[in-house]
Amino acid sequence: MTAQGGLVANRGRRFKWAIELSGPGGGSRGRSDRGSGQGDSLYPVGYLDKQVPDTSVQETDRILVEKRCWDIALGPLKQIPMNLFIMYMAGNTISIFPTMMVCMMAWRPIQALMAISATFKMLESSSQKFLQGLVYLIGNLMGLALAVYKCQSMGLLPTHASDWLAFIEPPERMEFSGGGLLL
């Protein structure tokens, strides 16, 4: 018997982590037993009955909205380095490729400026919507100014009086150069 009793006692120590649901108390412990001082409570350490509001999620959402609004506002400014590279690669000759590049460089900011009210609606949830709208507007105007500059460097803009009046002679070139040599 002692061997049998020792085995039961050993088994009890070995599986101390197990919850004994059958026994003198009926095995059902609720929230009322929590403060009874029993060592093997059903609740983990640090458990609270009341729900704690999570403010970090609201703060994270607000930060993400601000970040997204700044991404929208800075979008046109991020396109300017690529437009500068395209302007450089297209050259100043009047042909189909540079003309299409200039048209696209001018059309994108014009299209964005025509749809600026829809963009401002996306920025309404931000606390810095006026500054973001101003940055968006300046970025699009800079893109448009780059397109106008490229048109002027290609000679597509009428900048001389001879472009407007038929009786005025166009300006004469003083010299022609090619490949670094004077012709």
Curated annotation (Swiss-Prot):
The keyword DNA repair does not apply. Residues 88-98, 149-183 are lumenal. It is a multi-pass membrane protein. The modification N-acetylthreonine is found at T2. Coiled coil: none annotated. Pfam families: EMC4 (PF06417). InterPro entries: TMEM85/Emc4. Part of the endoplasmic reticulum membrane protein complex (EMC) that enables the energy-independent insertion into endoplasmic reticulum membranes of newly synthesized membrane proteins. Preferentially accommodates proteins with transmembrane domains that are weakly hydrophobic or contain destabilizing features such as charged and aromatic residues. Involved in the cotranslational insertion of multi-pass membrane proteins in which stop-transfer membrane-anchor sequences become ER membrane spanning helices. Isoform 1 is expressed in brain and heart. Isoform 2 is expressed in heart. It is found in: Endoplasmic reticulum membrane. The chain crosses the membrane at residues 67-87, 99-120, 128-148. One of its GO terms (cellular component) is EMC complex. This is ER membrane protein complex subunit 4. Component of the ER membrane protein complex (EMC). Its main location: endoplasmic reticulum. Keywords: Acetylation, Apoptosis, Endoplasmic reticulum, Membrane, Phosphoprotein, Transmembrane, Transmembrane helix.
